Amino acid sequence: MIISKEVKLVVENEDAVTSGEVENSEEEAMELSLRPQTLDQYLGQKRVKKEMSIYIKAAKQRDEALDHVLLYGPPGLGKTTLAFVIANELGVHLKSTSGPAIEKAGDLVALLSDLDPGDVLFIDEIHRLAKPVEEVLYSAMEDYYIDIVIGEGQTTHAVHVPLPPFTLIGATTLAGQLSAPLRDRFGIVEHMQYYTIDELEKIVQRSSDVFHTSIAPEAAHELARRSRGTPRVANRFLKRVRDFAEVKGEKTISLATTEGALKQLQVDDEGLDQTDRRLLRTMIEGYNGGPVGIRTLAANVGEDMETIESLYEPYLLQHGFILLGPRGRMVTDKAYLQLGLPVPGDK
């Protein structure tokens, strides 16, 4: 197997990334510095890290490509970052793309044909692959070959193209939308969980160091507490709170500034934002708390169904604001109380 010393990122936009090096800019460099390079640097997801560490070591000891990996869970939990870390730990190149970007089977064939032994192909939003594209993956994943049809009419014939052993890492927010044949070809399946407040605090403190910003411990805790268990949200909030602190002339981000900034951003003490509250109010005021079907809800709030199901519902479900039943979603008493509304049946 050919092993390289560092991860080489290849994406569709070659103007943005060339030879694995992102074009220099302070903001891009800062974003890259937030991304851990090893499993030890990767915060949170302890179970996933422990398992992946074993699988990676075993693959390296056998001098084999790592088995194909499926990472699923809500957005912003570090699936893409973990894919980069896995490739880095393996010491191989990583090529990155997304399901919607692979429009036809030929696009995927070109990607697969350009892989070196042991390389990682990362496909984000893999549930959005077109069916003809997905079918090309079956033989590629299972037996490391693809059949290419050449010619037209009576001259049509299939060419058998062997592929080097490689690892496909697929990421999805909607694992249920993967077809069974594709899902069954992943030897490693990992469910990414929401982060604890303590884990998010560490991420906030690490990110503040990268941003050359100081944040008070109580401010970091409050920011982490309202970040929906999601590192991406925590980092986004930190950037905005940093803006407020700089305008106020604070050298260290205070709790008061953090609370004031999050209030301005309309993020409440449970981490609910304007869209969360609109979803809950729609179910309460328009449908007496539910049950409400996803199509009806999406039409009423002006969001697409996939966004609601992947971005908003997982957090609302896990934190007890809604329940899912056979006829749709229903709000809980906790949702009424959070919105300051009387709970039905209470006197």
Swiss-Prot record:
Its EC number is 3.6.4.-. It is found in: Cytoplasm. Residues 13-195 are annotated as: Large ATPase domain (RuvB-L). One of its GO terms (biological process) is DNA recombination. The keyword DNA repair applies. Residues 196-266 are annotated as: Small ATPAse domain (RuvB-S). The keyword Oxidoreductase does not apply. Residues 269-347 are annotated as: Head domain (RuvB-H). One of its GO terms (cellular component) is Holliday junction resolvase complex. ATP binds at L34, R35, G76, K79, T80, T81, E142, D143, Y144, R185, Y195, R232. It is an enzyme of class 3 (hydrolase). It catalyses: ATP + H2O = ADP + phosphate + H(+). Mg(2+) binds at T80. GO terms for molecular function: ATP binding; ATP hydrolysis activity; four-way junction DNA binding; four-way junction helicase activity. Belongs to the RuvB family. Has 3 domains, the large (RuvB-L) and small ATPase (RuvB-S) domains and the C-terminal head (RuvB-H) domain. The head domain binds DNA, while the ATPase domains jointly bind ATP, ADP or are empty depending on the state of the subunit in the translocation cycle. During a single DNA translocation step the structure of each domain remains the same, but their relative positions change. The RuvA-RuvB-RuvC complex processes Holliday junction (HJ) DNA during genetic recombination and DNA repair, while the RuvA-RuvB complex plays an important role in the rescue of blocked DNA replication forks via replication fork reversal (RFR). RuvA specifically binds to HJ cruciform DNA, conferring on it an open structure. The RuvB hexamer acts as an ATP-dependent pump, pulling dsDNA into and through the RuvAB complex. RuvB forms 2 homohexamers on either side of HJ DNA bound by 1 or 2 RuvA tetramers; 4 subunits per hexamer contact DNA at a time. Homohexamer. Forms an RuvA(8)-RuvB(12)-Holliday junction (HJ) complex. HJ DNA is sandwiched between 2 RuvA tetramers; dsDNA enters through RuvA and exits via RuvB. An RuvB hexamer assembles on each DNA strand where it exits the tetramer. Each RuvB hexamer is contacted by two RuvA subunits (via domain III) on 2 adjacent RuvB subunits; this complex drives branch migration. In the full resolvosome a probable DNA-RuvA(4)-RuvB(12)-RuvC(2) complex forms which resolves the HJ. PANTHER family: HOLLIDAY JUNCTION BRANCH MIGRATION COMPLEX SUBUNIT RUVB, PTHR42848. This is Holliday junction branch migration complex subunit RuvB. The lineage of its organism: Bacteria, Bacillati, Bacillota, Bacilli, Lactobacillales. The gene is ruvB.
